[in-house]
């Protein structure tokens, strides 16, 4: 027996009204995720543009870092707070700035502002993909894939400095600043010899290779290419059916490699799996570095190189280079520690 609810009164509470308005069909979809995405993205991007244009890093790193000071698009950055600030959120209303906006900028308050709003903005974008996927009734693999770069951002900009002594050891937001951070990672963590970095490189470069191969193969096997020998003339968005042959592609790669993907689902899943796994493995490696876990150490080679001046490997050469990075970076990057290294302790050896 079926019962019918005869109470047809329209239940328009505040949530229903908000839900209808947020999900209204408009040029730019807002949705519930937009309440997180748009404000956080606006504040993060606005804070970064303000920082690289006007704000100095003289009080935090002893550097010029803005367009106003003569930097260009590659050398400008929003620098991390000084090491003395530890893990403070550096709120404008906090004890460090006390509502003094200029002081807040001087002590590096923009960096945690951008990092936190940027992280929540990225999460909002992932939730946006979930929300729209549900609305149009497709699977949420786009959102799942986008979670991989989010994991990298969170591990590098938030988890790593949380494992160290302060935000100071996170990357500053700028191109040259990121390069400096990469050199720092190599010198202090031997990052290139970390297996998680190796998996990350394999995932990202492998994904680029897969993308190039896939695009070329589809173009190779087009069989309804318009009335012209020129492929580009046939890029017609009004064509309703696909016009490439999976069978032909399978036959081609079977002859090239001896193996080939048997169906499109497995092929495209693999194209998702490779980069996502690589990025997540690299993020996991960064979490390890936050805890100061070491990369591969070939101590026997180091001992033999120390005893025998004629023995060296590419590994021992890199170890000496890492020592050089540490010695030079520590003094320049942490001026408040007042490190002074006499000439005799700087790395000298077979490799340098």
From Swiss-Prot:
GO terms (BP aspect):
photosynthetic electron transport in photosystem II
Cofactor remark: The D1/D2 heterodimer binds P680, chlorophylls that are the primary electron donor of PSII, and subsequent electron acceptors. It shares a non-heme iron and each subunit binds pheophytin, quinone, additional chlorophylls, carotenoids and lipids. There is also a Cl(-1) ion associated with D1 and D2, which is required for oxygen evolution. The PSII complex binds additional chlorophylls, carotenoids and specific lipids.
Q: How does it sit in the membrane?
A: Multi-pass membrane protein
Q: Which domain of life is it from?
A: Eukaryota
Please state what class of enzyme this protein is: oxidoreductase
Binding of pheophytin a: at which residues?
129, 142
What Gene Ontology molecular function terms does this protein carry?
A: chlorophyll binding; electron transporter, transferring electrons within the cyclic electron transport pathway of photosynthesis activity; iron ion binding; oxygen evolving activity
Presence of the UniProt keyword Electron transport in the record: yes
Q: Which CDD domains match?
A: Photosystem-II_D2 (cd09288)
Q: Where in the cell is it found?
A: Plastid, Chloroplast thylakoid membrane
Its main subcellular localisation, reduced to a broad class, is plastid
Q: Which reaction does it catalyse?
A: 2 a plastoquinone + 4 hnu + 2 H2O = 2 a plastoquinol + O2
Gene3D superfamilies cross-referenced by the UniProt entry: Photosystem II protein D1-like
Q: Where does chlorophyll a ChlzD2 bind?
A: 117
* Alphabetized InterPro entries for the sequence: D1/D2, Photo_II_D1/D2_sf, Photo_RC_L/M, Photo_RC_L/M_CS, PSII_PsbD/D2
User: Where on this chain does a plastoquinone bind?
Assistant: 214, 261
Q: Pfam families given for it?
A: Photo_RC
Q: Could you tell me the keywords of this UniProt record? A: Chlorophyll, Chloroplast, Chromophore, Electron transport, Iron, Magnesium, Membrane, Metal-binding, Oxidoreductase, Photosynthesis, Photosystem II, Plastid, Thylakoid, Transmembrane, Transmembrane helix, Transport
Any one GO CC term of this protein is: photosystem II
NCBIfam families listed in its UniProt record: psbD (TIGR01152)
Q: Which protein family is named in the record?
A: Belongs to the reaction center PufL/M/PsbA/D family.
The record's HAMAP family line, in alphabetical order, gives: PSII_PsbD_D2
Q: Tell me, in a sentence or two, what this protein's role is.
A: Photosystem II (PSII) is a light-driven water:plastoquinone oxidoreductase that uses light energy to abstract electrons from H(2)O, generating O(2) and a proton gradient subsequently used for ATP formation. It consists of a core antenna complex that captures photons, and an electron transfer chain that converts photonic excitation into a charge separation. The D1/D2 (PsbA/PsbD) reaction center heterodimer binds P680, the primary electron donor of PSII as well as several subsequent electron acceptors. D2 is needed for assembly of a stable PSII complex.
Q: Which PANTHER family does the annotation name?
A: PHOTOSYSTEM II D2 PROTEIN, PHOTOSYSTEM II PROTEIN D1
Q: How does it assemble?
A: PSII is composed of 1 copy each of membrane proteins PsbA, PsbB, PsbC, PsbD, PsbE, PsbF, PsbH, PsbI, PsbJ, PsbK, PsbL, PsbM, PsbT, PsbY, PsbZ, Psb30/Ycf12, at least 3 peripheral proteins of the oxygen-evolving complex and a large number of cofactors. It forms dimeric complexes.
Name of the featured protein: Photosystem II D2 protein
> Lineage in the entry?
Eukaryota, Discoba, Euglenozoa, Euglenida, Spirocuta
């Amino acid at each position: 027996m079926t019962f019918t609810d005869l109470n047809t009164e329209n239940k328009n509470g505040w949530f229903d009204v908000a839900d209808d308005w947020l999900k209204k069909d408009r040029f730019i979809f807002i949705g519930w995720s937009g309440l997180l995405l748009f404000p956080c993205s606006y504040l993060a991007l606005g804070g970064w543009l303000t920082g690289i244009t006007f704000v100095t890093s003289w009080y935090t790193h002893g550097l010029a870092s803005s367009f106003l000071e003569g930097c260009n698009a590659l050398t400008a950055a929003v620098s991390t707070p000084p090491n003395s600030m530890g893990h403070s959120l550096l709120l404008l209303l906090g004890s460090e700035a006390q509502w003094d906006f200029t002081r807040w900028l001087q002590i590096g308050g923009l960096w945690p502002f951008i990092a936190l709003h940027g992280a929540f903005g990225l999460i909002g974008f992932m939730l946006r993909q979930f929300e729209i996927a549900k609305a149009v009734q497709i699977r949420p693999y786009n959102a799942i894939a986008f979670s991989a770069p989010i994991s990298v951002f969170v591990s590098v900009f938030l988890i790593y400095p949380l494992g160290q002594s302060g935000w100071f050891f996170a990357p500053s937001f700028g191109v040259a600043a990121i390069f400096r951070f990469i050199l720092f990672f190599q010198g202090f963590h031997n990052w290139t010899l970390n297996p998680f970095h190796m998996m990350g490189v394999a995932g990202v470069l492998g994904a680029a290779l897969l993308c190039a191969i896939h695009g070329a193969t589809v173009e190779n096997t087009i069989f309804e290419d318009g009335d012209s020998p020129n492929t580009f003339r046939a890029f017609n968005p009004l064509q309703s059916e696909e016009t490439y042959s999976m069978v032909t592609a399978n036959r081609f790669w079977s002859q090239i490699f001896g193996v080939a993907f048997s169906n499109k689902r497995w092929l495209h899943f693999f194209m998702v799996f490779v980069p996502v796994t690589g990025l997540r493995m690299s993020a996991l490696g960064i979490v390890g570095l936050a805890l100061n876990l070491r990369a591969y150490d070939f101590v026997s080679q180091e001992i033999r190189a120390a005893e025998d001046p004629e023995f060296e490997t590419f590994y021992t050469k890199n170890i000496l280079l890492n020592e050089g990075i540490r010695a030079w970076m520590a003094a320049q990057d942490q001026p408040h520690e007042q490190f002074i290294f006499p000439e005799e302790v700087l790395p000298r050896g077979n490799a340098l």
